Amino acid sequence: QALYSAPKEVFERLSAFAANGGTLVATFKTGFTDEHVKVNCDRQPAGLSECMGAWYDRFTAPKNVGMSGETFGVSKDELQAQDFMELVEPTGAKVIAFYDHYMWKEYAAVTKNSWGKGTCYYIACKTSSAYIKKLTASIVKEAGLWGWKQEIAFPVIIKEGVNQEGKKIRYLFNYSGKEQSVKLPKEASKVSRVLKEEGVVLKKDRLTLAPWGFVVEEI
């Protein structure tokens, strides 16, 4: 989701986060207005154009606009700009994907820019689910944040948090009406205790969740 409205200070902190070694990913319509929903007159994406190494001042609704460049193995049918696209011009950023269209082929659809110790990515259009999944997986892996939890996809959901006692808690949910089975690595079996479960079967490294089943663990 785009950070459509926010005060200038928020974007300054995001830029500083990336400069200090973070990975920042922003999408189309980010920074379009301030906290009062007044359109920013700065170069778009306002407050982030410098760290993104790219900017735009025009946008349009795509019609039969494909994407070229890094495809991540996604089929041609899935390489389409959808609903909204910004005509981004790089000022230092590397272009990951261009628009595949005779009128818009010089403009960037996805960019990557080194900023201080970190990296900034800008996604200038709505893409297919298949493409955005591949793109974000690539970004997470490059940032060194990919682990076994990222291998598990919807409808099995994993959430973690800290309870009032300061204990780390993990929740695994089956958000569907069908039984789901996932393979767990050894590190996932390091559980202090199971707090609550419903419709759960664990055999060796295979966890099976009944429809709408869940397990809550202290780890």
Regions found by a protein language model. Give the residues of each.
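A conserved amphipathic helix/loop scaffold
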Residues: 2-219
